[in-house]
């Protein structure tokens, strides 16, 4: 699994406007049709281009090894769970080498992944995850983001709140020396969150994968070795 895009950069595809589509929908479709990572994901059988973001994070920080328990928050359509399953060599009958995935949207089965179609913020979901883990997690990862509205400050705050919730959960279920990965949007309000993360983990890094669109303000918070 590599991020080499040779052969995936196609000739620019124009999108015909339609009265049934909004301007933002047309822009999204144009990006999708001309995105080499979308084409590569389709060819290699990954659920989404986000799979390459996690792969790049792993290549940079060497996070995943066999015999891990992982929680994937906001998992649909399953790109991150797919990558994690391959990296830890997960299997459906292993108790100590598995991934627990949560999302409101359904995802198709993935080897070694136990999926719950639940709202992460419902009161009983946390108990359900903890029960399924049957112990502490090595990694909690979250690619959750709120539905963007195009207002950068609002999108920043909404996704930051999701990250804060994911962090609170991670601190409950991670083993000592466990890792936390989460998406945030840059915007200036993240300092309080970063200070808390730095207090709880030995190493905290920001990382923007090459597979993250250049115009996007998203970055990934990579917190290593929980104290």
UniProtKB/Swiss-Prot annotation:
Catalytic activities: uridine(2552) in 23S rRNA + S-adenosyl-L-methionine = 2'-O-methyluridine(2552) in 23S rRNA + S-adenosyl-L-homocysteine + H(+)
Subcellular location: Cytoplasm
Protein keywords: Cytoplasm, Methyltransferase, rRNA processing, S-adenosyl-L-methionine, Transferase
Alphabetized InterPro entries for the sequence: RNA_methyltr_RlmE (IPR050082), RNA_MeTrfase_FtsJ_dom (IPR002877), rRNA-MeTfrase_E (IPR015507), SAM-dependent_MTases_sf (IPR029063)
Residue sites binding S-adenosyl-L-methionine per the record: 78, 80, 103, 119, 143
GO molecular function, one term: rRNA (uridine-2'-O-)-methyltransferase activity
EC number: 2.1.1.166
Active site residues per record: 183
SUPFAM superfamilies: S-adenosyl-L-methionine-dependent methyltransferases
Keyword Cell cycle appears in the UniProt entry: no
GO cellular component: cytoplasm
Major localization class: cytoplasm
Primary role: Specifically methylates the uridine in position 2552 of 23S rRNA at the 2'-O position of the ribose in the fully assembled 50S ribosomal subunit.
Family: Belongs to the class I-like SAM-binding methyltransferase superfamily. RNA methyltransferase RlmE family.
The protein's name in its UniProt record: Ribosomal RNA large subunit methyltransferase E
Source organism phylogeny: Bacteria, Pseudomonadati, Pseudomonadota, Alphaproteobacteria, Rickettsiales
